[in-house]
Regions:
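Glycoside hydrolase catalytic-domain context in secreted enzymes
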Residues: 1-364
Length: 364
């Protein structure tokens, strides 16, 4: 076998993109991502994540756009159009009312019809009607009773009948508890697929519990997606997307998305000497983990390097103190080395605690 490293662009976080309030920026980011997916030999990207930011403790808020349904739907639509302009499938998720990670596999979202229509569905409705995504991912949670993946009113009555969407549904990984109910509700593809699901669907089809016309419709939508893909069409991918052009997009959109909430005369800094406190000044958190994980890129600029590049002098004694502290924390947390990929966030270093004497000595 041949091993190859891939270096895709680290595009801006979704909430940064939404902070631009710019449809064209969303299109450019989506277009860049769609291009890289295509040129690296893939057909489908499982994004954008469009759940509303309703709780600041939600562990995947960095993947979402906003607490505003209109802004989320509009930016999401621009992103989807951009991705699919490159012939790559987008997959808006997690549909719907999947707004927390705590107990996410079994959480019951009890939502009134008015709140559902005006808040939780609205972002998806705008996105569907303005961009026509090829696929949509259903969520883990239950919605007013049944699991979202098994909710006929949600998947068929609202989205297909009312909104007129004709694309393919895919479940979140191992969502729901009844494969046949998911098929009957209108969910087309179950991921990642289990033997017990195959058997349940076959038995239900043979017994008549799962009508063939329903199964045929599910399969038809999957095939309609497949025949649009790069690989089905025999596209010869290059492994060389235009990373320089995409880096320019990141620079422009990242700058446009910066929001200064409060200044109080502190910025710009008057002096040129700075002292950095806090572990993440030296060991930054680049993003989420698990399903929403990001890897630290090979081409990064640390906070210290960035400050020095623009002429600031970073206080050296603190660098040494935090370097030693982080090394000790690494040994404490991972005595046998860091574990491989996990769906749970890695343990983080405890903050360095300074006594008054240590603090005075550090800043003298």
């Amino acid at each position: 076998s041949i091993h190859r490293d891939y270096y895709p662009t680290d595009f801006v976080a979704s909430m940064t993109l939404a902070s631009t309030w710019d449809r064209e920026a969303a299109f450019k980011v989506g277009q860049g991502i769609g291009n890289e997916v295509r040129e690296f030999g893939l057909d489908w990207i499982l994004s954008p994540a469009m759940n509303l930011i309703r709780n600041p403790l939600c562990g995947r808020n960095h993947e979402y756009y906003s607490e505003d349904p209109y802004l989320s739907g509009t930016i999401g639509a621009g992103y989807v159009r951009g991705v699919q302009s490159e012939g790559t499938a987008a997959c808006p998720k997690h549909f719907v009312a999947n707004n927390q990670e705590t107990n996410r596999n079994n959480n019951i979202s009890q939502v009134s019809q008015r709140a559902l229509r005006e808040i939780y569905l609205k972002a998806f409705e705008i996105m569907v009607k303005e961009s026509d995504p090829w696929t949509i991912m259903t969520s883990y949670n239950k919605l007013n009773g049944p699991y979202a993946v098994q909710n006929y009113e949600l998947l068929t009555t609202i989205v297909r009948d009312e909104w007129g969407w004709k694309g393919m549904y895919v479940s979140d990984w191992n969502a729901g508890d009844d494969a046949v109910a998911a098929m009957l509700a209108g969910n087309d593809m179950l991921q990642p697929g289990q033997d017990k699901q195959y058997q349940a669907i076959l038995e239900a089809a043979k017994s008549g519990k799962l009508p063939m016309e329903v199964l045929d419709a599910n399969v038809k939508r999957i095939l309609e997606y497949v025949i649009k893909t790069h690989n089905f069409k025999g596209y010869k991918y290059s492994n060389e997307p235009n990373l320089k052009a995409h880096a320019k997009v990141v620079r422009e959109v990242g700058a446009d998305g910066i929001v200064l909430l409060k200044n109080s005369g502190i910025l710009p800094l008057a002096g040129k000497k700075v002292a950095l406190f806090g572990c993440t000044s030296y060991d930054w958190i680049s993003g989420g983990s698990g399903f929403g994980g990001t890897s630290v890129g090979h081409y990064t600029v640390s906070l210290i390097e960035g400050l020095r590049c623009v002429g600031y002098e970073v206080y050296k004694p603190l660098i040494g103190i935090y370097t030693q502290h982080l090394a000790a924390e690494e040994k404490r947390l991972f005595p046998n080395g860091r574990p491989p990929f996990s769906l749970m966030p890695p343990a983080r270093a405890d903050e360095k605690q300074f006594t008054a004497e240590e603090l005075n000595a550090a800043i003298e």
